[in-house]
Amino acid sequence: MTKIDTSRPESVLPTPSHTVGPFYGYALPFPGGGDIAPVGHPDTITVQGHVHDGGGNPLPDALVELWGPDPDGRVPQVDGSIRRDPATGGYLGRNGVEFTGWGRIQTDANGHWYARTLRPGALGRNAPYLSACVFARGLLVHLFTRIYLPGDEAALAADPLLARLDEERRGTLIAADQGRGTYRFDIRLQGEGETVFLEFQ
């Protein structure tokens, strides 16, 4: 450990801005994090895609966090649904009943992620969407975006955020319908087709 004399603030070097961390790996993995929907719920959808860097390469070590309202547009106010072993504290899984609206998914070796959640209802004047937060190497700060689902063109056209974007940029926020309740949403961190990211306050 390096000791630094902090009695003279002008002699203290700032922490390098290119260093992110410290990371506590044991706290990040969230087994079953993509299983957000209660088991057997009729409004369950699957949202899946890839996370790509600026060169178009898939990122095998990114984290995607999702949260969203229930099908009636209500933001869940329930406690977490994770079950832990009372003796060891180990992860047992979600309880399969409560819908918290939140999940954390790690991308696989091909940069792929997927989540089973409930189709979100509309919040106010917004078209239905899921919020997403991306953590990945090379990012000093995590990125926020939205995942809108296609199908209700009138709601998408009236959405205040989407209405401010040109068609090409708008398309980076709308998932592709793959049929049978499955949607694809690729996240591009930079470059051509870069996903629109939002400032969250």
Residue ranges of each PLM-predicted region?
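Beta-strand-dominated extracellular/periplasmic modules and repeats
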Residues: 1-201
